[in-house]
């Protein structure tokens, strides 16, 4: 599994102050642009992409309806994604499929989409349908993060992930059970077939995240022969 760490600057000054060397242990950087005012995102973008030049990077606009910090109309959402994609070519672009399904066709030319679904309230009963619909669209990566309230919630998502990965070995998945009880899903990614696990450096970007240092130790232990 690859370890992903999010950067969440709230201003140009915070973006410029980021120390890229602190993130060297992360395999991929996620830029959570939703922590900025929407009119500042394109102004801050050059600083982020210069700071992490040569690193794999995910561009994410996590909207409030899916647990993020910003509200965007479909037109604003698509415009910002297309502008960043055109000028900076991030390795991955997160797209909130269920929040912006009506404009998804405008993204069909982008081969590096992370089609995502986030639910900070529960693990919905229709998880299999969600995973199936996202898989059929054949994105670069399917990402599902849902809140776990019981151990069974966690086991269900892990089992679904393993099943879908077995049936679709070429498709990459990232599935996360959020919350304290869901922490185990973050360290068993290789078993379930999940390609990434999100870790924190300073500030967590989702409930239940484990520190990057701890995740590195866990990965080293799991990788031992």
From Swiss-Prot:
| A Pfam family per the record | DHquinase_I
Active site feature: 118 (proton donor/acceptor), 143 (schiff-base intermediate with substrate)
Q: Which gene encodes it?
A: aroD
GO MF terms on file?
3-dehydroquinate dehydratase activity
Give the metabolic or biological pathway: Metabolic intermediate biosynthesis; chorismate biosynthesis; chorismate from D-erythrose 4-phosphate and phosphoenolpyruvate: step 3/7
- Give the GO terms filed under biological process for this record: 3,4-dihydroxybenzoate biosynthetic process; amino acid biosynthetic process; aromatic amino acid family biosynthetic process; chorismate biosynthetic process
Keyword vocabulary terms for this entry: Amino-acid biosynthesis, Aromatic amino acid biosynthesis, Lyase, Schiff base
Assigned EC number: 4.2.1.10
Q: Does the keyword Amino-acid biosynthesis apply?
A: yes
| Similarity comment text for this entry | Belongs to the type-I 3-dehydroquinase family.
| Superkingdom of the source species | Bacteria
For this protein, the record's NCBIfam families field holds:
aroD (TIGR01093)
Q: Which InterPro entries match?
A: Aldolase_TIM, DHquinase_I, Type-I_3-dehydroquinase
Function, please?
Involved in the third step of the chorismate pathway, which leads to the biosynthesis of aromatic amino acids. Catalyzes the cis-dehydration of 3-dehydroquinate (DHQ) and introduces the first double bond of the aromatic ring to yield 3-dehydroshikimate.
This one is known as 3-dehydroquinate dehydratase
Quaternary assembly: Homodimer.
UniProt-annotated binding residues for 3-dehydroquinate: 6, 30-32, 62, 186, 205, 209
Q: What reactions does this protein catalyze?
A: 3-dehydroquinate = 3-dehydroshikimate + H2O
